[in-house]
Amino acid sequence: MKVRYAFQKLENLPEGFEVPAGRVKTWGTAHAILSCKDMIDGPFAVINADDYYGREAFKQIYDYLSVHEDNEKYQYAMVGYQLKNTLTENGSVARGVCDIDSNGKLVSVTEHTTIVKRGDNAAYTEDDGKSYTDLAGDTIVSMNLWGFSKGFLSEIAYGFRDFLQEGLQHNPLKCEYYLPSVVSRLLDSNKAEVKVLLTTEKWYGVTYREDKPMVMTALKKLEENNFYPKQLCGKLEAAANFCFEGVYKEEIPWGMDILMILTVLHLKMNKE
């Protein structure tokens, strides 16, 4: 697999806009994808750079993008995880709870910022813990594994101007252009359909420092069960410590926001 890096630059703005004085924060996840537009010439998938999604989930998104094309509407996909497979014992998490219609299409995503684990189920609070609402463990949530056609890039660019005109007035130093907001706009305007691809995969991420040992153990078991080779690349240590300036470093450069933006995996389809 060929790996290329796209850099999210503050000054990458439409004509007529300038970076506000004092702004250091990047423009958000939708803008991160826009930063990759010159590298994408077909369907593509988007993931969080520092999460583990499971092999089955990648196959699902690849299979979908291989056979689906836009028609009168954009045809997108999202892998939906069972809430119980995304929780931690070490504190609360934020999750996007999915509303799905009878045809398996996404209707909306409702963000809950404080969800806690309760056995095999969960509950969320919106009043700092004064009250909780139960959530079933098999509730479907979005973990930001999306599949898009190339046309999504045009829609991001189209909405970016409107975002800037409003955001720069109200919160010029911190406003962010989020990927889900673009999807929501297209769903609300009936321009897109998003197929929810259900998975029973376990999602792993280090939300809290205390999560790290559990995640390391889980990934080790996958290796021992031959899900993955023991060494994923020729020089694993060098790959892990390769900083974006192209210089080998002794420490992993987490301070760079690690493209906290999103990693974009471009899926080139062989249609011969």
Name the predicted role of every residue range.
Residues R55-L145, K150:
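Conserved core of the sugar-phosphate nucleotidyltransferase
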Residues A157-R161, Q165-K191:
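A C-terminal functional module that forms or caps the active site or interfaces directly
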